[in-house]
């Protein structure tokens, strides 16, 4: 049965495909979309950026032409795109897929996006830029220990849940209490309901062996350089955006910008980019294991069997 034949029938549960970078998620999602009349919805926080097609390994234009793809490259790099903004866009994509009778397939490696999708999201108001910038300046000037002590004095509950390695989360908690007068924990308790309740999705986490994954990460980074990643980063750097913006911190971008400034050789920048990506993959394993235990862990060589079961389930649910 062709994609066109199945693409308009009613669909049951959504499918969530997660995993570390370079684990083969995109290929699996495309195969499932073709087999089950699906639409691919991005759940990767870096692949949303228009400026970063190559360095973030977004699907190719040829793949995008085969089945509908949503939430890829739809945000300018100058935007500090939040999880809340993604959830809003994802809700529209999910509604559109269901209206067309297509299987919604969420794919990516950003754990917070999947957590928001399946467990809801807190309703913290937007933090004024001046508050955020002031907290960041204090972090750089005084260090993380001083910032954590400040948080402990103002929001001991939040501080008690964070250690000194959580620089970003410490700063975030302090921003929230300064801007709103309320603890981040209180805001979390008033969160939005999930887009996908527990019984409304199938979820898989692709888990290659570490050695295999790291080899794939290294090879893919080199392939991205060969495909023009350096020129892409050069165009991004020419915009002179705030280096703290998410797009400016995508894996490989800071090191390649340092190369363009003459601070690193290309080999040195590539070595840093590969290492940063491997470290991120390691953190992804840890995060999903502890935060999203409902995901079924599958080795890449077992993925086809899982995919066949999902196709059969989609047909039964539709």
From Swiss-Prot:
Gene3D superfamilies: 1.10.20.140, P-loop containing nucleotide triphosphate hydrolases. Coiled coil: none annotated. One of its GO terms (biological process) is tRNA modification. It catalyses: adenosine(37) in tRNA + dimethylallyl diphosphate = N(6)-dimethylallyladenosine(37) in tRNA + diphosphate. Its EC number is 2.5.1.75. Keywords: ATP-binding, Magnesium, Nucleotide-binding, Transferase, tRNA processing. The record marks 110, 132 as: Interaction with substrate tRNA. GO terms for molecular function: ATP binding; tRNA dimethylallyltransferase activity. Transmembrane segments: none annotated. Residues 44-47 are annotated as: Interaction with substrate tRNA. It is an enzyme of class 2 (transferase). Substrate binds at residues 21-26. SUPFAM superfamilies: P-loop containing nucleoside triphosphate hydrolases. ATP binds at residues 19-26. Its cofactor is Mg(2+). PANTHER family: TRNA DIMETHYLALLYLTRANSFERASE. Monomer. Belongs to the IPP transferase family. Catalyzes the transfer of a dimethylallyl group onto the adenine at position 37 in tRNAs that read codons beginning with uridine, leading to the formation of N6-(dimethylallyl)adenosine (i(6)A). This is tRNA dimethylallyltransferase.
């Amino acid at each position: 049965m062709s994609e066109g034949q199945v693409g308009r029938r009613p669909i049951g549960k959504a499918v969530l495909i997660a995993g570390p970078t370079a684990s083969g998620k995109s290929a699996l999602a495309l195969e499932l979309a073709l087999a089950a009349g699906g639409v691919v919805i991005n759940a990767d926080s870096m692949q949303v950026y228009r400026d970063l097609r190559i360095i973030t390994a977004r699907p190719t234009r040829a793949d995008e032409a085969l089945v509908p793809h949503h939430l890829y490259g739809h945000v300018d790099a100058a935007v500090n795109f939040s999880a809340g903004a993604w959830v809003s866009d994802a809700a529209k994509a999910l509604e559109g897929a269901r209206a067309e009778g297509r299987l919604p397939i969420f794919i990516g490696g950003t754990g917070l996006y999947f957590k928001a999708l399946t467990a809801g999201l807190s309703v913290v108001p937007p933090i004024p830029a001046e508050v955020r910038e002031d907290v960041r300046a204090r972090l750089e000037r005084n260090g993380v220990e001083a910032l954590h002590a400040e948080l402990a004095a103002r929001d001991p509950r939040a501080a008690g849940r964070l250690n000194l390695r959580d620089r970003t989360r410490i700063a975030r908690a302090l921003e929230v209490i300064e801007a709103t007068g309320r603890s981040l924990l209180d805001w979390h308790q008033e969160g939005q309901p999930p887009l996908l309740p527990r019984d409304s999705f199938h979820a898989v986490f692709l888990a290659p062996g570490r050695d295999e994954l790291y080899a794939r990460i290294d090879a893919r980074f080199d392939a991205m350089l060969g495909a023009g990643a350096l020129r892409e980063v050069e165009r991004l750097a020419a915009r002179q955006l705030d280096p703290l913006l998410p797009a400016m911190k995508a894996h490989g971008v800071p090191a390649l910008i340092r190369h363009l400034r003459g601070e690193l050789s290309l080999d040195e920048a590539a070595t840093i980019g590969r290492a940063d990506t491997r470290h991120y993959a390691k953190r992804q394993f840890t995060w999903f294991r502890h935060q999203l235990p409902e995901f079924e862990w599958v080795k890449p060589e077992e993925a086809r069997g899982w995919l066949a079961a999902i196709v059969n389930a989609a047909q039964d649910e539709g």
